[in-house]
Regions:
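Feature captures the catalytic cores and cofactor-binding loops of soluble hydro-lyases/lyases
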Residues: 1-131
């Protein structure tokens, strides 16, 4: 694996770097893969359906619009992601079940932890361009 700084040096015009506002919650702090994008607000139905697919060499990037209303990922979904070989999950929003997530061999980055579960209305949109 090529160090991030070396990738930045080699491809300065081709890469985008996530702002350092995300905290590590998973069992791995370094991960990489093809980005699979999802935009959703306070609804993790599509997070689950994504993580139930083969995630080999993929990272799920969820734009939860920075919501602090509930968690979009918990221990059960982190376990599903690990079982399906996802490299990692980045959430512009919250997670819960921190002690369950940290034992999974998957990278998880999010803004914060929140104990409340999300709604389940099948909301959200896949494969969107995120800023």
């Amino acid at each position: 694996m090529l160090p991030t700084a070396d990738i930045c040096d080699k491809y300065p015009e081709s890469i985008l770097i996530a702002k350092p506002i995300f905290k590590d919650f998973g069992g791995r702090t370094a991960f990489f893969g093809k980005a699979v994008t999802l935009k959703t607000l306070d609804d993790n139905t599509k997070v689950r359906s994504s993580l139930e697919t083969d995630g080999t060499n993929k990272v799920l990037v969820v734009d939860g619009e920075g919501s602090m209303n509930c968690a979009l990922l918990g221990g059960n979904l982190a376990s599903i992601a690990s079982e399906n070989n996802w490299s990692g999950i980045i959430i512009n929003g919250c997670v819960r079940d921190q002690l369950e997530i940290i034992v999974e061999k998957i990278g998880v980055k999010a803004l914060a932890a929140h104990p409340k579960k999300s709604i389940k209305n099948d909301g959200g949109e896949f494969n969107v361009t995120l800023n």
